[in-house]
Amino acid sequence: MGTESEITVGFIGNPNCGKTTLFNVFTGANLKVANWPGVTVERVEGETSYKGRQIKLIDLPGIYSLTSYSIEEKVSRKCIMEEHIDVIVNVVDASSLERNLYLTLQLLEMGKPVILALNMMDIVEERGMEIDLHRLPELLGGIPVVPVSARKKTGLDVLLHAVLHHYEEGSKGSVVHYQKEIEDLIAQTEKKLETHYGKLVHKRWYAIKLLERDEEVLTYYPLGALSKEMNYEKQIINQKYDYIEEI
């Protein structure tokens, strides 16, 4: 975690979910803009404070998933896993909730504290849609779910309060439990990671990525015993979507 005086928060979400607009509401015009090391993707940082705590905000690129197929996805993964992000604020378009939740389930597997910011709630209300704000957190493992509107600037204090509280409380962990065959393989792979890379944290996420034959993870954490034919990416993806359908 970061220092006692500062909490580092990563804002992440699908493209066009209103993430950057919400980020800018908190940070104003006082932004630090540069490129992520080695790539042309912009890195945008800002700061805010709440109840005497300084909060550094990082606006991560808009992505749909945490694969390693695009530069934006690689940048986001690297930042979350290696740059001491204390809390993840996952901004979602509440009017297209099902489409946005795939990324949420992936983030929960990374072992970091996640807060779901339901943006565009004003649009949900205008369209007469309903979201069960009691059931949704339960189905996502008890993570904070905060309705906000970047456009109307509502729910901002509640979101910052959730950041402080969830920072102290820690991660809720993964909510998707796969079929027994895959769960057994995840457990076996975690044990191998423990043997070969004992200091590696969030081993479940890395184990899942290895079973998906994620090229970047395979390069950094090769396990010779993993068969090249062993690729469970489709099953893992499908079971995530099955879980979302239940929501």
What would you call each of these model-derived segments?
Residues M1-Y69, E82-E83:
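Conserved G1/Walker A P-loop phosphate-binding module
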Residues N24, G46, I58, I71-K78, ...:
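Solvent-exposed alpha-helical segments within well-ordered globular domains of core cellular machineries
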Residues V33, Y64, S68, S95, ...:
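Catalytic cores of large soluble enzymes that bind and process phosphate-bearing ligands
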Residues G38, G62-I63, A94-E98, M120-E125, ...:
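Conserved nucleotide-binding/hydrolysis micro-motifs of P-loop NTPases
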Residues G46-K51, V75-V145:
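Conserved C-terminal guanine-recognition region of P-loop GTPase G domains, centered on the G4
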Residues D122-H177:
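Canonical P-loop GTPase G-domain recognition
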Residues P144, E169-I247:
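Extended helical scaffolds that flank P-loop GTPase cores
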